[in-house]
Swiss-Prot record:
InterPro entries: Fructo-/Ketosamine-3-kinase (IPR016477), Kinase-like_dom_sf (IPR011009). Gene3D superfamilies: 3.90.1200.10, Phosphorylase Kinase, domain 1 (3.30.200.20). This is Probable ketoamine kinase EAE_16955. It comes from the Bacteria. The keyword Magnesium does not apply. Ketoamine kinase that phosphorylates ketoamines on the third carbon of the sugar moiety to generate ketoamine 3-phosphate. ATP binds at residues 92-94. Signal peptide: none annotated. Its EC number is 2.7.1.-. The keyword Nucleotide-binding applies.
Length: 286
């Protein structure tokens, strides 16, 4: 793998560049993570089994999409590829620090500008991706209520059922979610898709976001994540509101949007997350 990475990075360096440092980083819960120094420049490397190359390719595509918006900072992508055994993603190395109040407010403003970027008539994305390690379908759909009910809540419930986890009648739940959102047809916004404190940090040049699960959806979905994480700086919400105030009805829709993340946690981690997801589902749709 390291030879394949060296070959790709050599194309971006002067002759004679080579690996000078290679340290595995702690906290790689999903993929192995490394700090690599090559040709005097630092890189962040994610790697995993070769079969997971599509996940890294999708992540690179999402980071490049967010970068094109010129509204939020994301790590620059330098290479994505594989050898016979491993796949990898090579990005800019940005040692993360927690957001302070000022930079949290600034990030909130940047997220608001991201949500205002470009005009897209439909909900979805040109390709499927992943929420954490869970596959996320993104087939284009014109009705927001249909998209969210079927491709977010219905999808999670089907995945749960495949693992023997049942939260109620899937068809009835999907219909109930769709009915509650039927009168809400927002302008599609490009979302980060997994906006929590673990995917936001302070870098050398200000706040940045990473590990996206992008799609075009209701901007309220990104903001609905914030109350689920008490450690998330509240200034993110304040900064967002200063640029693009949320519409009436946001607080009523918020519990419905939170179901997507709560169901995903229940599938991934089980235990108390199953109880939390069931309680949230019952309360949101009562």
């Amino acid at each position: 793998m390291w030879q394949a990475i060296s070959n790709l990075l050599s194309e971006q360096h002067t002759d004679g560049a080579e690996i000078e440092l290679r340290n595995e980083l702690p906290g790689g819960e999903i993929h192995a993570a490394w700090h690599l120094r090559f040709g005097g420049k630092d890189y962040f490397v994610k790697c995993d089994e070769r079969e997971l190359l599509p996940i890294f390719t999708a992540e690179a595509d999402q980071l490049e999409l967010l970068s094109r918006c010129k509204t939020v900072s994301v790590p620059q992508v330098f290479a994505v590829g594989s050898d016979r055994d491993y796949s990898f993603l090579v990005m800019e190395y940005l040692p993360p620090r927690p957001l302070d109040a000022h930079n949290a407010f600034l990030l909130g403003q940047q997220i608001a500008h991201l949500h205002q970027w470009s005009d897209q008539p439909q909900f979805g994305l040109d390709f499927d991706n992943d929420l954490s390690t869970t596959p996320q379908p993104n087939a284009w759909q014109r009705r927001w209520s249909t998209f969210f009910a079927e491709q977010r809540i219905g999808w999670q419930l089907e995945l749960a059922a495949e693992k023997g986890l049942h939260f109620g009648d899937i068809d009835n739940i999907v219909e109930s979610v769709q009915q509650r959102l039927s009168s809400h047809q927002p302008q599609p916004s490009l979302l980060h898709g997994d906006l929590w404190s673990g995917n936001c940090a302070l870098g050398p040049n200000g706040p940045y976001i990473f590990d996206p699960a992008c799609y075009w959806g209701d901007r309220e979905c990104d903001l609905a994540m914030l109350p689920l994480h008490p450690e998330q700086p509240p200034q993110i919400y304040d900064g967002y509101q200063s640029v693009s105030p949320l519409p009436a009805g946001f607080l009523e829709r918020q519990p419905i949007y939170q179901l997507y993340t709560l169901l995903n946690r229940a599938i991934l981690f089980g235990g108390q997350h199953l109880v939390t997801a069931q309680k949230a589902l019952d309360e949101a749709l009562q």
